[in-house]
From Swiss-Prot:
This is Sodium-type flagellar protein MotY. It comes from Vibrio anguillarum. Disruption phenotype: Mutant is nonmotile. It has an intact but paralyzed flagellum, and shows a decrease in virulence. Residues 1-21 form the signal peptide. The lineage of its organism: Bacteria, Pseudomonadati, Pseudomonadota, Gammaproteobacteria, Vibrionales. SUPFAM superfamilies: OmpA-like.
Amino acid sequence: MNKWVTATIVMTSILTSFAPMAMDKRYVATPQQSTWQMVTNTPLECRLVHPIPNYGDAEFSSRANKKINLDFELKMRRPMGETRNVSLVSLPPSWRPGESADRITNLQFFKQFDGYIGGQTAWSLLSELEKGRYPTFSYQDWQSRDQRIEVALSSVLFQEKYNVFSDCVSNLLTYSFEDISFTILHYDRDNVQLNKASQKRLAQIADYIRYNQDIDLVLVSTYTDSVDSRGVSQDLSERRAEVLRDYFKSLGLPEDRIQVQGYGKRRPIADNASPIGKDKNRRVVISLGRTII
């Protein structure tokens, strides 16, 4: 009886000693595996990706906009089966054992979604990586309640590609598709060319189109004031429309994606009795459409 009790105690002790080893499952690229890839580098978008073996990809991205922006996504091979509370800490690499862990924040990963962080916290991740540390996400495994998952970003080989990413972000256009998708520009009297202020705005639209392959429709509608006769006004608006058709074709857009229409003095938006009203009516409305996948 005593031998049985002793054996049971010994076995229990052995199992207990091994239990903590089964509690955590850690995903991180080894120094030999660690890579950072600049997968998109254009004036419209910057994307920096870090593969995490057997787990998925960590991705930083920033897009053309009025405001500087940064998004981070933890793209998982298997989406979260349940919503989980997540602890985000910054850990030192194994070769710097004297350093302590620093808490960054607490957040949630939602069921059926990849992990997402935006704003200042995303910038904090980059800052920790630049210091050579390992930002680490920790949460309870939704498949095994007695196990926690740890997912770490390796800072090995980070700095070089981060420099490229930073340069890309600094060169992003300072406006988004939404800022230019509907634009009203203006003409001087009896001129088929836009006025100087509108030409600058048109150049912005052109820059966006040059770098975006998703623009599949450009609608151009031109209008005049009421100074001239109906026939003269119609002819002027049609010539203005054709000038813009040629302009958008020169950017590489296929002709079947460009639709232009001259309306002459029809559809005024202001009173033609005043100079200000005439200026407003001498206009072109440019609308852009794009394919969203």
